[in-house]
Amino acid sequence: MGAEMGAEQPETIAAIVAAHRAGTLTPAQTLARSYQRIRDHNDPAVFISLRDEKDAIAEAEKLAARADAASLPLYGVPVAVKDNIDALGFPTTAACPAFSYTPTHDSTAVERLRAAGAIIIGKTNLDQFATGLVGVRSPYGIPKNSIREDLIPGGSSSGSATAVGAGLVPLTLGTDTAGSGRVPAMLNNIVGLKPSLGMISTAGLVPACRTLDCISVFALTVDDAALALSVMAGPDQADPFSRDRPLGAITPFPATLRLGVPRNGQLIFFGDRKAEAAYGEALKRWTALGATLVEFDLEPFYETARLLYEGPWVAERYLVIKNLLASAPDSIHPVTREITAAGARLTAADTFSALYRLQGLRKIAERTFANIDALVLPTAQTAYTTAQVLANPIELNSRLGTYTNFVNLLDLCGLAVPASMRADGVPFGITLLAPAGRDALLASIGRVFHADTKLTVGAKGVAQPALTPPATGGIDEIPIAVVGAHLSGMALNGELKALNGKLIEATRTAADYKLYALPTTPPKPGMLRVEAGKGSAIELEIWSLSSSAFGKFVNAIPAPMAIGTIRLADGRSVKGFLVEPAVLGEARDITAYGGWRKYMAEAATA
């Protein structure tokens, strides 16, 4: 059940979940395949902790027995997690044995993955304390690059990226403070999604720079990465840096798209002519797809990048390990120790001076994006061998951050996408960057670009799946989810029809909602999102209204009803009916019915 299974086996999340739902493959078989591939890959440096196979398969079998299993967006998908993110059943080491601890609960991101049907199989290697873009700074070894073994795997999320690239699992979590979710994606020919700051909770993450940290996603396709993001996205009271941002939906490739490219002479490739040529070919591809390329001044972005390690943000890294630096300095990788120790020497004056300059640079970035939808840059300017990096660890690592270090300081979202495979067997990728909140736009255009390259995914030589057109409504139409009397054939459905509403589909929520019957006359339902694992999937319908009709409809909704964001079983998000929690004291929990229609049918016969 190893690599010889070839292209006929489902490799992407979408294909694996579809096979589980169809019954052509069981979650237990998928887990067994992952473990066999791990054995065949024979690289002990990928995982710091690996779950016992029998235990993981037992969980897969238990999951498959659930009545709602098929509705879960990540039904039976094996997932690995970077070992600076807490996951129950595994120690968290941050690649430093002296720092290791046993978490008492899942990080919020892992909790949401499990609730969506994912099965966590292990914790992956990283540059110690997530400090580095190279993947060689770990006492647990250097993971093999999945494309060319002489190349660095990229970091700091080295194990997570190589695990996806090698086909061991279709989804992993990384982190991204300075490029750790993007550089290793390029070097392993996979997709790396760095969401907007605060979109995925960092509760349960060992910080690198707490104000800049993101949990990131590695996957084989943009659609897979976007699905994983939709499962994890959302505010979290446990994370003071969490932000409640609409995720948005993947849309068709826009009719007009303006992409920013640096002015002539501003790009730096450090003499790598093949990378420079590959970037030029990528720009030609964007033009052929219909994008307009607009030059912008990259120098303010370079200046911002220099602030990350030359400015006070290195003090955040120092705060994480200052006690360990004092008590057991030899337990810290020498390069990591050298970088972080500098944080102790920074002053408050240094900090405020840098913050003032950063604010000015942010204003420049805002003006840049005033007439540009997104930037398109090389993910990294070259690819180094492990031998080169070990001989010159700090300078070459710094070079790899040329196009990544400024991103979180400027509050941008990013999507790293494979662009080409060079003649020398080195993968090349581009990164799309946009202001926070434009994650869906990047996914919408990035998926089309990746598909157009016709590249195989990862290192397995498997073709990309056919690109599925995103669901579309009419121009100026807004989808809305209804769960009660507005359902087809029920008492208030006429309100939607009177506004020329159109039924799009009948589906279910993700499995983290409860449904209540409110003590009103006539009876009304109230749906509420609850803690992961404590709810169920609720039946609903999605209708489409024009924006003006949507406004009229929402304006007429009486308290305690409200419109909020609802996660669907397939991972999408849509606006729909929710209830204010304060009125649920005397309400009846009717979640077990699975929907309002079934509850009302039984009530009518009582």
Where are the predicted features?
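Acyltransferase
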Residues: 24-31, 61, 271-297, 321-327, ...
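Conserved small-residue hinge/capping positions at short loops/turns
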Residues: 70-93, 119-122, 126, 131, ...
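A short helix-breaking turn/cap at a secondary-structure junction
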Residues: 194-277, 281, 300, 444-472
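Short glycine/serine-rich loop segments
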Residues: 106-232, 408-431
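Short helix-loop capping/hinge segments that flank enzyme active sites or metal/cofactor-binding pockets
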Residues: 74-96, 253-262, 312-366, 418-427
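Glycine-aromatic micro-motifs
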Residues: 421, 447-452, 456-606
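An N-terminal boundary/leader segment
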Residues: 1-58, 288, 458-464
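Serine-dependent amide/ester hydrolase catalytic core
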Residues: 15-21, 125, 254, 267, ...
